[in-house]
C-alpha cells in the first residue's frame, strides 16, 4: 500500500503573548485556522526509514537526515511503540520555511498520523498529540485537525467553528527565526488574557492582534512592506505566527487569484480557504476505508 496525505498550512488569526514561564516558554492565546493548501507526504513500503524532499517549482535544499522533523516524528513513533518497521517517505514541499504557516509542524503531524496508519500501530489522537508536543508546540493542533482556540504554550486546544473564509497568504522571500522573535527584549509579554469571543468574526479586528508583528517588522522591514501592500489592496492584513508570511481575508478566491498576479517581484503567495476539519483527516479516513474495502475483497492494495 502506498499512502499519500496532505500536510495543510495554518494561520494564526491572532497571537497574544500573555506571560512567560520559569522554563522560558511563552504563554499565549491564539486561534488556529487550518487551510486547504499545503505540503504532501507519500509513504511507500520499505525495510528501513528514508526521506526524499522535492521543492515544488525549484531545487530542494531541505535536509533529509534526522534533523528533519518528519524523520524525528518517525523515530519518536518507533521509540514510543517499539516498532522497527520502515517506510520510504517523499515530501513535496510547497509551504515556505520560516513562514509562520506551520510547514514543519504540519509535516511532522502528517508523518505521525500517516505512519500510525501505515504501520497499523493503532495509537489514539491523544497519544499522537503527546508525541507531537515533544517535537513542537504547534504539532498537536495539526494532529487533532480542527480549527482551534489554543492557550498555554499552544498545547491547550479547544476546537471551534470558523467561517470558511478565503485568504491570500504572501511570503516576502525572507526567513524568520522563531527564536529570534521570542528572544527579543522588546516583545510584548503581558497582553491581558482574553475570553473566547461570542463571535469569532471579531478575532480579525483591532481588539485582537499579533504581538510578534511589531518586533518582526523591526528586524525585517520587508514584513512591514508586505503588510502595507496587503492593506492597500484588501483593507486588512496581519502576520501569522512569528512571520514571515502575512495574510488578508478576502471577499472570495477570485479576488486572491487576481492579486497573486500583482505581487511584487521576489514575493510568493497562495490563495486558500480555511476549513474546520483538516484535509489530512478527511483524506486519511477515505484512504483507510478504501484499504479496508480492498482487503475484504481480496484484491491487492
Curated annotation (Swiss-Prot):
Keywords: ATP-binding, Isoprene biosynthesis, Kinase, Nucleotide-binding, Transferase. The keyword Kinase applies. It comes from Alcanivorax borkumensis (strain ATCC 700651 / DSM 11573 / NCIMB 13689 / SK2). PANTHER family: 4-DIPHOSPHOCYTIDYL-2-C-METHYL-D-ERYTHRITOL KINASE, CHLOROPLASTIC. The keyword Transmembrane helix does not apply. Gene3D superfamilies: 3.30.230.10, GHMP kinase, C-terminal domain. It catalyses: 4-CDP-2-C-methyl-D-erythritol + ATP = 4-CDP-2-C-methyl-D-erythritol 2-phosphate + ADP + H(+). This is 4-diphosphocytidyl-2-C-methyl-D-erythritol kinase. Catalyzes the phosphorylation of the position 2 hydroxy group of 4-diphosphocytidyl-2C-methyl-D-erythritol. GO terms for molecular function: 4-(cytidine 5'-diphospho)-2-C-methyl-D-erythritol kinase activity; ATP binding. NCBIfam families: ispE, PRK14608.1. Belongs to the GHMP kinase family. IspE subfamily. Transmembrane segments: none annotated. The active site is at residues 10, 138. ATP binds at residues 96-106. One of its GO terms (biological process) is isopentenyl diphosphate biosynthetic process, methylerythritol 4-phosphate pathway. It holds the Pfam family GHMP_kinases_C. Pathway: Isoprenoid biosynthesis; isopentenyl diphosphate biosynthesis via DXP pathway; isopentenyl diphosphate from 1-deoxy-D-xylulose 5-phosphate: step 3/6. Its EC number is 2.7.1.148.
Amino acid at each position: 500500500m502506498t499512502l499519500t496525505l496532505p500536510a495543510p498550512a495554518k494561520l494564526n488569526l491572532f497571537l497574544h503573548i500573555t506571560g512567560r514561564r520559569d522554563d522560558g516558554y511563552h504563554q499565549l492565546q491564539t486561534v488556529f485556522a487550518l487551510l486547504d493548501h499545503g505540503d504532501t507526504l507519500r509513504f511507500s513500503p520499505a525495510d528501513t526509514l528514508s526521506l526524499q524532499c522535492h521543492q515544488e517549482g525549484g531545487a530542494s535544499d531541505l535536509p533529509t537526515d534526522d534533523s528533519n522533523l518528519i524523520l524525528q516524528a518517525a523515530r519518536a513513533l518507533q521509540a514510543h511503540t517499539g516498532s522497527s518497521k520502515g517506510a520510504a517517505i517523499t515530501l513535496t514541499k510547497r509551504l515556505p520555511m520560516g513562514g509562520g504557516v506551520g510547514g514543519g509542524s504540519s509535516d511532522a503531524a502528517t508523518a505521525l498520523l500517516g505512519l500510525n496508519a501505515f504501520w497499523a500501530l493503532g495509537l489514539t489522537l491523544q497519544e499522537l498529540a503527546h508525541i507531537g508536543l515533544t517535537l513542537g508546540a504547534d504539532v498537536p493542533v495539526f494532529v487533532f485537525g480542527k480549527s482551534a482556540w489554543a492557550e498555554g504554550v499552544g498545547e491547550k486546544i479547544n476546537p471551534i467553528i470558523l467561517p470558511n473564509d478565503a485568504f491570500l497568504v504572501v511570503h516576502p522571500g525572507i526567513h524568520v527565526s522563531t527564536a529570534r522573535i521570542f528572544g527579543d527584549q522588546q516583545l510584548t509579554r503581558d497582553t491581558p488574557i482574553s475570553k473566547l469571543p461570542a463571535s469569532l468574526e471579531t478575532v480579525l479586528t483591532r481588539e485582537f492582534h499579533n504581538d510578534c508583528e511589531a518586533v518582526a517588522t523591526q528586524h525585517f522591514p520587508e514584513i512591514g512592506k508586505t503588510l502595507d501592500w496587503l492593506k492597500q489592496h484588501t483593507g486588512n492584513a496581519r502576520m501569522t505566527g512569528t512571520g514571515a508570511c502575512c495574510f488578508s481575508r478576502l471577499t472570495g478566491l477570485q479576488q486572491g487569484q487576481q492579486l497573486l498576479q500583482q505581487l511584487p517581484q521576489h514575493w510568493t503567495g497562495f490563495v486558500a480557504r480555511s476549513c474546520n476539519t483538516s484535509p489530512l483527516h478527511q483524506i486519511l479516513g477515505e484512504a483507510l476505508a478504501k484499504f479496508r474495502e480492498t482487503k475484504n475483497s481480496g484484491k491487492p492494495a
